[in-house]
Amino acid sequence: MSTHPTGNTGGLIEVRSIDFIPDAERHGGLLSQFTLWLSANMQITAIVTGALAVVLGGDVFWSLIALLLGQLIGGAVMALHGAQGPQLGLPQMISSRVQFGVYGAMIPIVLVCLMYIGFSASGSVLAGQAVAQLLHVDDAAGILLFAAVIVVLTVCGYRAIHFVGRIASVIGIVAFVYMFAQLFANHDIGALLANRHFTLASFLLSMSLSASWQIAFGPYVADYSRYLPRSTSSLGTFFAVGLGSVIGAQAAMVFGVFAAALAGSGFAHHEVAYIVGLGSTGAVAALLYFSIAFGKVTVTALNAYGSFMSMATIVSGFRGKGAVSSRSRLLYIFGMICVSTLIALSGRHSFLKEFTAFILFLLAFFTPWSAINLVDYYCFTRSRYDVPALSDPDGRYGRWNAMAIAIYVIGILVQLPFLSTHVYTGPLVDALGGTDISWILGLVVPAVLYYVGARGSRRSIPERLILPLERGEAQP
């Protein structure tokens, strides 16, 4: 697997791309993982996602419990992916070639790219609203200004994103503490919690919202832990990533639940203004608008950076290369942000409805991939990967792994009868009282099928991690 020259590994702009990170370039600690994922989740889109639990018919009390359960389940799945990063030193999706084949991995990777674009677009709408309020411009100008910041940060890469994550985590904590204090001081929260009307459909819908939120990070979470020293504890990485993500998302979604319950029908299309209005007016409101915009910087940069990784993985699979040029990197990043910005500009007036459909439908495509990847890594291969073979269609992992691809497709199909979104509603949803259990099947069925299939296969698993240098390739 070819690699970039190291260059100035401590410089402002990252040199590495999808290639293996050698031990000499590993750095960072678990605290940076916690702050990165805390800041990535403690933001406006998570608030809106929590609000959907109430907007779509749930009460406050049971919505809070369901969201927490979904966070814990989805967060565990997401953190298991994150723990792979230090051991492999590779981006998340390129490691999917072990399960799907060098060409076969492009099937889930293409869908991952769509995910990045969708999340970036929806996040840009909310960040654009905050920038517009802060600078007294229209929403379109706010979206464009926000996109320009994301381009710069993403081009700088890994170190810059982690640095901004640390700053954003501090700003986010201060902002949320203030907004919660204002919320509890000025509103009767007890009355909201006392108004209970449990329905299984609403409860599982709320679980689906938070579980899908967490699982959707799975395809790129290891991208941001791959520079950690290989000696980093896998359990420590699991908890640093998982706790940061779950705590940040749950705090934001709890606030969203209360905000939507207080706002009623006035929440839709005015999400940012209403949330800030709960906190304060005047100069303090301006600071809250800034915190909202800055809070979106981290996660949108993650999306753009992950998109670059995924696009580079697709192209390198056909070219048999393990790295991409700096020019290609810039083109991938700029292209992705342009597309997501255009979507944000064209869809900003119907954001809430479209985002609901997007995030729930998205889950059907990523739970099977996640199940296959995790079962393969933790039950069979661990960190025993042949890194050079990841770029060789004629190597150990081949072009296509028919078994994994078939199980992935089955994992999607088995969910369809039970899937309930604005995009598609399965035929068995009404029989279950409107309850959506598709994501549970999407995790369990592919996991069981892949475990059985992999145990019976004759594929070759190396005895240890094989690095590029051991195949006589250029010294990284």
Predicted regions span which residues?
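Transmembrane alpha-helical segments of multi-pass small-molecule transport proteins
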Residues: 109-113, 134-156, 170-181, 210-221, ...
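Transmembrane helix-loop boundary segments of multi-pass membrane transporters
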Residues: 54-65, 129-143, 159-168, 273-280, ...
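C-terminal membrane-solvent junction of multi-pass transporters and transport-like membrane proteins
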Residues: 369-448, 463-465
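Hydrophobic, membrane-embedded alpha-helices of multi-pass small-molecule transporters
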Residues: 28-47, 180-186, 196-259, 282-304, ...
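Hydrophobic alpha-helical segments and their helix-loop junctions in multi-pass secondary transporters
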Residues: 137, 170-196, 210-215, 254-262, ...
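Membrane-interface "cap" regions at the ends of multi-pass membrane proteins
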Residues: 1-60, 202-208, 226-236, 457-476
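Loop-to-transmembrane helix boundary motifs in multi-pass membrane proteins
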Residues: 314-349, 396-415
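Helix-loop-helix connectors at the membrane interface of multi-pass transporters/channels
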Residues: 93-97, 124-141, 229, 303-334, ...
